[in-house]
């Protein structure tokens, strides 16, 4: 490993700063106890950057990210900035430009049902008896969100709007390669989602994925139409391992997978480019209604650190230790308010961070 592994820390708005404080506890243990050569520098982003510097993504923040090996992101946005035009609000003017600037073409969204949190899932107990551990791999920079032409117009008093789904073979190839590589370290199954019975772009998607799969004979590939996949995820989520999908389909499916865990505050995510530079963040939002109350769940932010260690630093064993610490804490019955089944007995944000940190060091 290089002399220093530099992390740009962007706490942002809402609950971002307080859950990031708990992530710092883990980072400092990795630095002091596991002797990882980490260097963390903090920068403004989102609403706080608008308030202090007049723009959601300041130049010095972008420069700080460019001079780093990874980005650890909190959350951005809140009603405070709703007076701004949509393109200048934190949600649009901070995260999307970061993704574009660093060409973060892939989004990894784990959706895991923890054995001790099955009561949170909206699915029936007989459906989730075996639990599930799904990784959604979503193409992030192509597809209908970015295709041209698009527009909104009017002709002969008839209003209409249109978008264009465009995928190039190289865009599909690189996300498929990543999905298969990730599956090799899991249950060795990839399910690719498409709508190839209707869409030309999906026909190409399926053809390219089939072609790429020949490089990974140890990984089983299956295909599902997106409408059937949505149903199958609800009926039997345990059948899935890695789900590979386009930008639009991934946007939908990753949220569905998150919803059936019943605990969005537990779910991290990673967005990576071809050089393995990544942005790591919780899957949930800024939750301004509970900001500053010390009741937010910090586990998604802590598990984002785990993903950074796993995918950014390629230190699987240490990432596993972070994950195991979270599992151990849950097994012993520790809960924050959002995952507690007892409204009068739960930990504060800082308390949960302390307990996970203690498990990471001492294993108890």
From Swiss-Prot:
A Gene Ontology molecular function term of the record: NAD binding
Binding-site residues for Mg(2+), renumbered to this chain: 227, 251, 255
Annotated metabolic or biological route of this protein: Amino-acid biosynthesis; L-leucine biosynthesis; L-leucine from 3-methyl-2-oxobutanoate: step 3/4
Binding-site residues, substrate: 99, 109, 138, 227
GO biological process: L-leucine biosynthetic process
Database matches in InterPro entries: IsoCit/isopropylmalate_DH_CS, IsoPropMal-DH-like_dom, Isopropylmalate_DH
Enzyme class label: oxidoreductase
Main location: cytoplasm
Annotated GO CC locations: cytosol
EC number: 1.1.1.85
UniProt site positions, description: Important for catalysis: 145, 195
The entry's keywords: Amino-acid biosynthesis, Branched-chain amino acid biosynthesis, Cytoplasm, Leucine biosynthesis, Magnesium, Manganese, Metal-binding, NAD, Oxidoreductase, Plasmid
Cofactor needs: Mg(2+); Mn(2+)
Pfam families in UniProt: Iso_dh
Note accompanying the cofactor annotation: Binds 1 Mg(2+) or Mn(2+) ion per subunit.
HAMAP family from the UniProt entry: LeuB_type1 (MF_01033)
Subunit structure: Homodimer.
Name listed for the protein in its UniProt record: 3-isopropylmalate dehydrogenase
Gene name in the database record: leuB
């Amino acid at each position: 490993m290089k002399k220093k592994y530099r992390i740009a820390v962007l706490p942002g708005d809402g609950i971002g700063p307080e859950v990031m404080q708990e992530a710092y506890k883990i980072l400092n243990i990795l630095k002091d106890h596991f002797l990882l050569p980490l260097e963390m520098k903090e920068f403004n982003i989102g609403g706080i950057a608008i308030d202090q510097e007049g723009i959601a993504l300041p130049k010095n923040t972008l420069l700080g990210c460019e001079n780093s090996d990874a980005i650890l992101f909190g959350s951005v946005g809140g009603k405070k900035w709703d007076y701004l035009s949509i393109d200048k609000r934190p949600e649009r003017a901070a995260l999307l430009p970061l993704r574009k600037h660093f060409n973060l073409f892939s989004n990894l969204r784990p959706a895991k049902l923890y054995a001790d949190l099955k009561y949170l899932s909206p699915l029936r107990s007989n459906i989730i008896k075996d639990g599930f551990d799904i990784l959604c791999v979503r193409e992030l920079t192509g597809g209908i969100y970015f295709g041209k032409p698009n527009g909104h117009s009017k002709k002969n008093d008839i209003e209409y709007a249109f978008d264009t789904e465009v995928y190039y073979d190289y865009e599909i190839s690189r996300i498929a390669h990543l999905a298969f590589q990730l599956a090799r370290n899991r249950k060795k199954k990839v399910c690719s989602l498409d709508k190839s019975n209707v869409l030309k772009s999906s026909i190409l998607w399926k053809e390219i994925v089939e072609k790429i799969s020949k490089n990974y004979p140890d990984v089983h590939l299956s295909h599902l139409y997106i409408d059937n996949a949505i149903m199958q995820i609800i009926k039997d989520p345990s059948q899935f391992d890695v789900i590979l999908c386009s930008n639009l389909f991934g946007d939908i499916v990753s949220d569905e997978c998150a919803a059936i865990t019943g605990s969005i505050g537990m779910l991290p995510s990673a967005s990576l480019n071809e050089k393995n530079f990544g942005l790591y963040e919780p899957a949930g939002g800024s939750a301004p209604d509970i900001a500053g109350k010390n009741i937010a769940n910090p586990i998604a932010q802590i598990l984002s650190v785990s993903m950074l260690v796993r995918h950014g630093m390629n230190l699987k064993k240490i990432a596993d230790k972070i994950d195991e610490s979270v599992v151990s804490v849950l097994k012993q019955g520790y809960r924050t308010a959002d995952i507690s089944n007892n409204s009068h007995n739960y930990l504060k944000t800082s308390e949960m961070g302390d307990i996970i940190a203690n498990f990471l060091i001492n294993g108890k």
